C-alpha cells in the first residue's frame, strides 16, 4: 500500500490531548471528601471538617499522577480567571449603574468618585455622603474612575457594555475549565513544553497584549483625552468607532495621521512624534504621566516582547533551548551550576510557583512605589485617598506573595526535591552552606535591630530629659541620608544627558518643579532627612527578619541538626517529641506562620511611613503666589524622630477622625475600626492557647451533654496546635488589616 503525502503528514502530528479522560458528573459534589479515602468515610470527630478544608485543594495528596495534578491546576486557573472577569465586570457594572462617573468627568478635582449607593435599611443610608455634583454615595478609592478616563470611556453606556463583555468572558472561562479537564485534557508533555510556553507567553500574552493596549491608547484614549483636557464636554466627543475609521477626524488632532503608514515603511518614524512622545514629567492639566508617553512605552514593550517570543527553539532547529541555557550556566566557583534545575522546574509546580510568587510579590511592591512617584492615570495624583489606598494595597499584596513564595519553596523542598538529581549544583551548594547563610542573616538582624531601635530609644530619652540638642535630628546631631540624596540629584540631572529630548525628569519625587492641579499638589520633590534615615533602617531591619524566618524555613525544610529526618514528617507537623530542647514550631509550615507576623510588622511600618510622609511633605495646596501648605504642616521631620512622636503625632493624632466618625458618612469606618480591633484581639486567644486546656474543657462540656442525653454523634476535639495557629494567624492579619484600612481611610477622606 502506498502512503500519500497527506497520510505522512498526519502520522507526524503529535496528539497532545486526551479525549474525554474524566466523565462529567455532579454525583461527587454530594460526597464531601470524595478525594480522600479517609475523609470520604465521613466525620467521626470535629477534626474532619478541618482536614476537609486543608486537603480539598492539595492535589498532591489526592493523586500521585503529575499529569492529573497538572490538569487539575490548569482547569482551576480557568476557574480563577472566571472569577477575575466576574469581579472586573461587577466593577464596571457599578460604574455604569450606581456611580457619578459622568459628573466626575466634568469636574474631577472637586467631585469625589462614588460607585456604591447603600440601600436605606436600618438607617445605614447615612453612609451615602455628599460627594459633590448632587450625588450621594460611598466615596470609592480604587482608582477605577481615573483608569476609565485614561482608557477613553466617556459615558455610563460604554461601562455597561464593557461589563457585559466581562460577563461573557467569565462564562467562556468556566466553559474552558470544564472543556480542558473533561473533554480535551492536555497531556503532561504539553505542560512540560517550556520553550513553546515561553514563546506564547512572551509574544502572545505580553507582546500582543502590550501592542493591543498601545493601539487602543493611540486610536481611542489619546484623542478622547486630548479633547477632555481641552475642556470639550464628554457628550460632544466623537464615539470610539468614529475615531477608529475616520482618518480626517484623527488628523485634526494628530497631523501625522494624514500620512498613514508611509512613514512607517519608509523608516521616517520621527513623523509619528506628535502622538508617540518622550516628554517625561507629568501633564500639568491632569497631574499624571503624559498619555502619549505611555502609549510610546507600551509600543516599545510590545516590540521587545514580540522579539523575545521568538527566542526559544520549538519546531524549527533555531533558537535557545532552556535546558541547554541552564546547564551552560556555570562559574568557576559554582560546581555544576544550574544543572538539574530544568528537571526540577518541569516536574515541580511548587518550585515554579515559588519563583513566580517571589517575582510577582516584588513587582507588586515596585508598582506601589511607582503609583505615587509617577501617577499613571489622569487626576489620580490629587485623589489622596485613592493614592494611599493603592499604595497600601500593592504593599500588602507584595508581602503576601513573598510569604507564599517561601511557603511553596518549602513545600517543594519537602515533597519534590531529590538530592540525587541536584548533586553539587547551585541549589545543593546553597543547602550545604545554609548554616553560614542563616547565621550571617541572624547577625545582620541583630545589628540592624539594635542600632535602628537604639537610635529611637536615644532620641526618646533625650527628649524626655529635655535635651533636644543631644538628639539625632536635622537641627542637632544630623544623620542625613547622603546616598539617597545623591541618587535623587542623579535622577534629577540624568535626563539632560541620558535622554536629551525629554522635557522633564522621570519623577518629581527626585527633584524639579511642584506639579499642582487646581492648586492641589499632585507631586513635588520629596525632601529626605534624619527622620527618614531612622525609619529607613527600621525598614531594613523588618525586611531582613522576615527574610531570615522565611529562608530558614526553606533551607531547613528537609532536615536540621535538631531533626535530621524532618522531610519524613512533612510540610507541617506540630512537634517531634520531647527531650531535645524543644522540637515544636520547627516545621516549614511554622516558619511561614512566623514569617507572616514579621511581614505584617514590615508592611505596617512602610505604609505608616508613606502615609505620614506624604501628608507632611507632599500632599496639600499651593497658593497663586506659590505658598505651599501641607496637610500636617511638615511635622514629619521633627516628630518622627522618636517612638513617642510616632505614637502621639501619627497614630493618636490621626486616629481622631476614625474615633469621632459616629453619626457621619464615615461611621462605617468607626465600626470597622472597633470590630477589627476585636478580631485582632480574638486572635491572641488562639495564639497564646494551651491545647490540653481546651480538650479538658471539651470533655467537661461533653460530660454535661451526656448527662442530659444530648450526646453528639460527632466527637468534639480541641483544635490541633497547627489548626489553632492557623486560626490565630488569619484573625491577626484580618484584624490588623481592617484596623489599618479604616484608620487610613477615615483620616484621609476627612482631610484629603
UniProtKB/Swiss-Prot annotation:
Cell compartments where the protein resides: Plastid, Chloroplast thylakoid membrane
Assigned keywords, A-Z: 4Fe-4S, Chlorophyll, Chloroplast, Chromophore, Electron transport, Iron, Iron-sulfur, Magnesium, Membrane, Metal-binding, Oxidoreductase, Photosynthesis, Photosystem I, Plastid, Thylakoid, Transmembrane, Transmembrane helix, Transport
EC number(s) given by UniProt: 1.97.1.12
Taxonomy, superkingdom: Eukaryota
Membrane-traversing stretches: 73-96, 159-182, 198-222, 294-312, 349-372, 388-414, 436-458, 533-551, 591-612, 666-688, 726-746
UniProt-annotated binding residues for chlorophyll a: 685, 693
Cofactor note: P700 is a chlorophyll a/chlorophyll a' dimer, A0 is one or more chlorophyll a, A1 is one or both phylloquinones and FX is a shared 4Fe-4S iron-sulfur center.
InterPro entries found in the cross-reference section: PSI_PsaA (IPR006243), PSI_PsaA/B (IPR001280), PSI_PsaA/B_CS (IPR020586), PSI_PsaA/B_sf (IPR036408)
Enzyme superclass (EC): oxidoreductase
Entry binding sites for phylloquinone: 694
BP term (GO), one: photosynthesis
Gene3D superfamilies: Photosystem I PsaA/PsaB
Topological type in the membrane: Multi-pass membrane protein
Entry's Gene Ontology molecular function annotations: 4 iron, 4 sulfur cluster binding; chlorophyll binding; electron transfer activity; magnesium ion binding; oxidoreductase activity
GO cellular component: chloroplast thylakoid membrane; photosystem I
Coiled coil: none
Chemical reaction(s) catalysed: reduced [plastocyanin] + hnu + oxidized [2Fe-2S]-[ferredoxin] = oxidized [plastocyanin] + reduced [2Fe-2S]-[ferredoxin]
Entry keyword annotation includes Nucleus: no
Main localization, broad class: plastid
Residues given in the record as chlorophyll a' binding sites: 677
Residue numbers binding [4Fe-4S] cluster: 575, 584
Protein family (similarity comment): Belongs to the PsaA/PsaB family.
Subunit structure: The PsaA/B heterodimer binds the P700 chlorophyll special pair and subsequent electron acceptors. PSI consists of a core antenna complex that captures photons, and an electron transfer chain that converts photonic excitation into a charge separation. The eukaryotic PSI reaction center is composed of at least 11 subunits.
Its job: PsaA and PsaB bind P700, the primary electron donor of photosystem I (PSI), as well as the electron acceptors A0, A1 and FX. PSI is a plastocyanin/cytochrome c6-ferredoxin oxidoreductase, converting photonic excitation into a charge separation, which transfers an electron from the donor P700 chlorophyll pair to the spectroscopically characterized acceptors A0, A1, FX, FA and FB in turn. Oxidized P700 is reduced on the lumenal side of the thylakoid membrane by plastocyanin or cytochrome c6.
NCBIfam families the record matches: psaA
Record protein name field: Photosystem I P700 chlorophyll a apoprotein A1
Organism (species): Emiliania huxleyi
